[in-house]
């Protein structure tokens, strides 16, 4: 038991110490650290470089893999987008050619990239990965063997020491010792193999360096191939640009003429020919400006090559064409008379004799470049023709020189310097340029020889759209005296498509409408009013007049015989009784309304408004006698309150009511037995008087007229409520006769 316990103790010690590495000498530790650095470097390079394809690099089976990888490349996707854009454009456009060329270049670049990646995988990544898989893996295996043998050797060594300490038999101690010696020899061999393998890897450092060098060479080859394709594509693009017509505005005259293979600038020829054909008689030609929007529109249309002959209607205004000519000359990088000869022209202008000026100008014109001389000759000939029509266009040679000289000669301006502008020099130079240009226009035959052919590339009489107005000038129709109605010219816009509204038919002096036969001699009348058979429309019958009251009818003004005859009495309808209110019962309806005690200086908010008591209508009283009450001075009776007809109303009705009343009274007297004509109050009359008032007399009536009626004072601060209208009673009969 004691021996077994000792063995278990030794095994436990060995087990606890198995993870601990044996102490190494300094040489192996340094070699191992260097190998670890190599391993880390190679692993990073292999991880970052393109991964190996499944096909194994080059070979017959790698073409499909290469195509798949090419289509996944970003350059190939860009090429597809460029090709799609190029297909949507016409083939004669420079942009379409450039897009197609760039698409081919991007595809080639994608193929070059994939080829470079495959070469990198084959020449660099494969070799580095072989070092990792073989060399580094072998070193790791040897290292594990050394660690295992070292652990075994340590265990045997401790067992030998324990056997000696426990005084084991000699045979057993010798056996353990022999095992220890054999393990030690094995450990030394494995250490040597491990060290040799690591040193071999270190010796292969040149191979690792050569792999990196091959990667760089591969990159150079890729960029060289790509550069060749880029240069070839760039050359084709440059040829396309050279074959394309340059932008006309802001381009040097020589470059524009070279790219278009012309002798005269296209803008100069187009403007001059258009103005020669339609515009020489335009007043203020080349002097009158135009709208900036129309100028910009035509300029950019010419730059975009959107405007071609025949010119559309929007680009036929002679003032716009003249402004385009001046703008083109002004935007040239170098003036038409050049910077080099600027001082010579200024010096010539200082000569006092015109003959000396002409001689020196003719000598200096020979120094102009060929392109400038040809265009100057062409332009000045056109200006001289315009000057010949100065009686119509009001543009003499002096006026033309003032307008055109700033666009043909100006000094060089140094934009880099911060020196102040020489305004005096600019004024002097402009006056000198006016003198030079005026001589070139007025004395054109002296400076130039031969005649100018204006229509070099354009066709005469085909510069404008046929069937439409070829001139939009402002004085086109000033001299017409015909009677035909003309529409106002519309400049730069299409004519109205919608037909105009027809004018009303004309009338003669008597207000009679003229028929189509009377206006048949007028062409515009025929157009507006075509001859048609007029249909007679029947006039509707007049409606019958409304039933008016008898006192408002026209016949009421003159009493007829039928009005004087007795008429049957109208049916008597009793008046509807009006209930008496509480206010009327107590006699409070005639009390004055309380008003606000305020001064003129008080504000509206300094007192409280006291509204008036609502006024109730008076209960109508029946007359004391059956007759019409005597009218008062104000034309109102006591019982009617201004609602029943008064005597004035009867008189205004021209006696119509009076005749009816007399007839009714006569019949009433006959029924009551009143034959003597005296006014006696009957019992019937007294019974009908519910107020039991005595009969009204003339004195009472005068007293009532003199007695003032109590009224409610109305103040501006009181609120009045409208009175309820009273129900008028029918006019009762009277027992008195009229005086007539």
UniProtKB/Swiss-Prot annotation:
UniProt organism field: Drosophila melanogaster
Name of the protein in its database record: Rho GTPase-activating protein 92B
SMART domains: RhoGAP
Basic and acidic residues bias (residue ranges): 659-672
Molecular-function annotations in GO: GTPase activator activity; phospholipid binding; SH3 domain binding
Xref: InterPro entries: AH/BAR_dom_sf, BAR_dom, RHG17/44/SH3BP1-like, Rho_GTPase_activation_prot, RhoGAP_dom
PTM-bearing positions, type Phosphoserine: 469, 473, 593, 715, 738-739
SUPFAM superfamilies: BAR/IMD domain-like, GTPase activation domain, GAP
Stretches with biased composition (Polar residues): 506-520, 643-655, 673-686
